[in-house]
């Protein structure tokens, strides 16, 4: 543990606070076990309904509940005796709730389900405008996911398959990538300083009103806010300190994030990217490949604990970066014009079509790794890998990255 003595004081303090907040969150965010409680709920649909012989089911967000600690949680709703897909996206019901291993399950009969009026906001207005302008199903689905953070559960099967099998499904999940692109594009519309302020205001508006408030968006927006403040005040910016600081705040105010895969995938992806770039000297191509490998390695063990991982994404991500940037650029311009400026919309759809066709081509033979890795195992592996990245320099960082990935290969069923 000699590396601990070499940690800068500021980083040591932030790391310690993060670990303390994690201990608090693991205790405060744990839901008590419940079984067979009939209570009142208001829920909002978070994905598509799935029809089965016994009824229909879908992921939902709990807007209101008689049990206070269930409010604001995501749950899985099963509607019994349903022979059709319920209309609407908001419902009230008296349901049987069961909580097991921090997961919430609600079941109710179809006659106990009542549709509620829709809550329209600026996000809904812009999404409707986008749907009116874009008729192709796959381009519409890509746009709704990329710009507005629509759940990947709402993607058409072919679109989900193409992005999932090539390892680029993260492109359709609003995260730091999207927040960073919005800031980069808006900040270039005005001169320095004014541009950074415009970019920050745009990101705050985008994160607050246009996309779901999921952990990656909150983390990325918080880190960007602190970076802009540091930049405008001519202060030194410590990326690792800010990552741990934002993580500390998120776990303190939203302790249930400590049980969220979304939070940890975002956290470790950014941590590995920052550690890969630390003490690394190389050209732009080398840095792009190392960043892509770092982001992949920082998420692969956790993903492997519940799904397959696709190594081809390490190459596809930097190769497709120009097209992804073009899609974001014309997407932001389309948002600014309320999708009323045809050239930007046409170029946005053209970029999206090219991305989709390239991924469709590679999806049929993209290799997939299915490792038998447990979540606890994945966390230990990621922590050890992060320590290895911190103490190495330059291309020596390939060693800890390689060890993490080789471990996943050795764990293949």
From Swiss-Prot:
It is found in: Cell membrane. It holds the Pfam family Competence. GO terms for cellular component: plasma membrane. The keyword Transmembrane applies. The keyword Lipid biosynthesis does not apply. The chain crosses the membrane at residues 10-32, 162-184, 189-211, 232-254, 259-276, 288-310, 325-347. InterPro entries: ComEC_N, Competence_DNA_uptake. It is a multi-pass membrane protein. Coiled coil: none annotated. Keywords: Cell membrane, Membrane, Transmembrane, Transmembrane helix. This is Uncharacterized protein aq_1618. It comes from Aquifex aeolicus (strain VF5). The lineage of its organism: Bacteria, Pseudomonadati, Aquificota, Aquificia, Aquificales.
